[in-house]
A protein has these predicted regions:
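Metal- or metallocofactor-binding catalytic centers and their adjacent structured scaffolds
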Residues: 1-43
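Structural signal for hydrophobic packing residues in well-ordered secondary-structure cores
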Residues: 29, 33-41, 45, 49, ...
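Catalytic core of soluble alpha/beta enzymes
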Residues: 119-272, 279-297
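Glycine-rich, mobile lid/loop segments that gate access to catalytic sites or pores
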Residues: 35-109
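Structured C-terminal cap/extension of enzyme domains
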Residues: 1, 5-6, 27, 238, ...
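Catalytic cores of large soluble enzymes that bind and process phosphate-bearing ligands
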Residues: 17, 21-29, 76, 93-94, ...
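Charged, long alpha-helical assembly modules
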Residues: 84-88, 95-140, 144
Length: 308
């Protein structure tokens, strides 16, 4: 088990009766293989990744992204007081209840969010990034018109009051080629408008090859790398590195429906590959996921610093 990458690739490509192992099996098995390689060689998991990809070991934290679930007000207060780097996800997955038929509810929420940060922060240097997942709902209220979608998204910038704003999944075009085309048109229109709001790809961007295709098309500013969807965790490393190399911001995400083990493993992957941000997980209670990810990251950084 000395070599993680060789073993991970073997099981990621293994076919039984003509079929690859389920992505979840490959995801979990590759985590066990990384842990085994670290234990067998007396290294941290982050060190194993750095060594096998010939990356520098950088003992510096990756910005963490807190997700609120539907508790998008109380959870935000917790995030502000704990100084979370990126917030709040917000789960804007319903037009009538959360977005508004003219986008007015999201506009009001972004205004409340920025006001809340500015009034509750304990240090004026705290300047978090706003990252809101809208699950394709903006496209629904603007009839999938990329210009109208972009105009609305650009108008939210003023409500953010100087805080960086990312909108994830503004549209769901129903298939990958159309999704790339729609996101590209929205991104280009935002540039034409001089907007600083950034677009994050989510829907139809699942596998390593999808991430490459969305990146090569310049379809957005950031892609979510949905860690369980890539199978073996070595694919996460490759995806982050591809984004970093080609000027695409990498968001190492995943799902609230993971385990404490996978969350901690993802910390090591992030510390090695260096995405722009990492999702706090598992769960949507926020506190639990923050404790798991924050503590693992800081333990690992402290151990890396002792080896310098």
């Amino acid at each position: 088990v000395d070599s993680f990458l060789t073993n991970a690739r073997f099981f990621d490509e293994l076919r039984i009766d003509g079929h690859l192992l389920h992505t979840a099996v490959r995801y979990g098995l590759s985590q066990a293989l990384l842990d085994a390689a670290a234990l067998a060689t007396g290294r941290l998991k982050a060190e194993v990744v750095c060594d096998e990809w010939q990356l520098p070991c950088v003992p510096e934290a990756i910005p963490l992204f807190g997700q609120s679930g539907d508790d998008r007000y109380i959870a935000v207060d917790k995030m502000i007081l704990k100084g979370v780097d990126v917030l709040p996800h917000a789960l804007i997955n319903n037009v009538e209840e959360k977005l508004g038929f003219k986008g007015e509810k999201l506009r009001e929420y972004v205004r409340w969010l920025s006001n809340r940060i500015l009034s509750l922060r304990t240090n004026e240097s705290y300047h978090p990034t706003l990252h809101i997942d809208v699950y394709g709902t903006i496209g629904l209220i603007f009839d999938m018109d990329p210009v109208r979608c972009a105009e609305y998204i650009a108008s939210l910038e003023a409500e953010a009051q100087g805080l960086p704003l990312y909108i994830e999944g503004p549209v769901d075009a129903g298939n990958k080629p159309d999704q790339i085309r729609m996101l590209t048109e929205i991104t280009q229109e935002l540039t034409r408008l001089g907007s600083g709001v950034k677009i994050v790809a989510d829907e139809w961007c699942n596998t390593y090859q999808d991430i490459v295709d969305f990146t090569d098309a310049g379809s957005c500013h950031m892609v979510q790398i949905k860690t369980p969807d890539l199978g073996g965790i070595h694919n996460i490393v490759d995806a982050v590195l591809y984004c970093n190399k080609h000027g695409m911001e990498a968001y190492q995400g995943g799902t609230c429906n993971e385990t404490e083990i996978s969350a901690r493993t993802c910390v090591h992957v992030a510390l090695a590959a260096r995405p722009m941000r990492m999702l706090i997980k598992p769960g949507m209670g926020f506190d639990e996921g923050l404790n798991i990810v924050f503590n693992e990251m800081n333990r690992t950084i402290a151990l890396l610093q002792t080896k310098d």
